[in-house]
């Protein structure tokens, strides 16, 4: 809501649902503060629109949060509620890789009995 910029000199972010959970409120506040700091201190912004890919949405948002400076154990509790409802895997861009099947070659093994 940019009307408050002219009346009160503030900006409102009406993105979040109301909650009384202290951890969620803290994570929302930290996210908005980091976003505002990036907007004030950023040197450039990209106007290129990216397409939404559900399989990498959580990973992309996690990387964005890290880019905002929400890095480390002190912001772990801030990242968790923001990423919890997103689809995809936070650790892998193209989904968790499938393990390769292990082949056992027992035909060439000779058993020695002693």
Can you say where each PLM-predicted feature lies in the sequence?
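C-terminal accessory/tail domains of diverse enzymes
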Residues: 1-114
């Amino acid at each position: 809501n940019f009307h408050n910029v002219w009346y009160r000199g503030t900006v409102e972010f009406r993105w979040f649902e109301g909650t009384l959970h202290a951890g969620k409120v803290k994570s929302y506040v930290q996210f908005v503060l980091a976003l505002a700091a990036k907007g004030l201190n950023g040197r450039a912004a990209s106007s290129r629109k990216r397409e939404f890919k559900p399989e990498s949405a959580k990973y992309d948002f996690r990387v964005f949060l890290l880019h905002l400076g929400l890095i480390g154990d002190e912001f772990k509790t801030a990242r968790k509620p923001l990423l919890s409802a997103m689809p995809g895997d936070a650790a892998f861009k193209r989904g968790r890789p499938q393990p390769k099947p292990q082949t056992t070659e027992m035909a060439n093994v000779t058993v020695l009995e002693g």
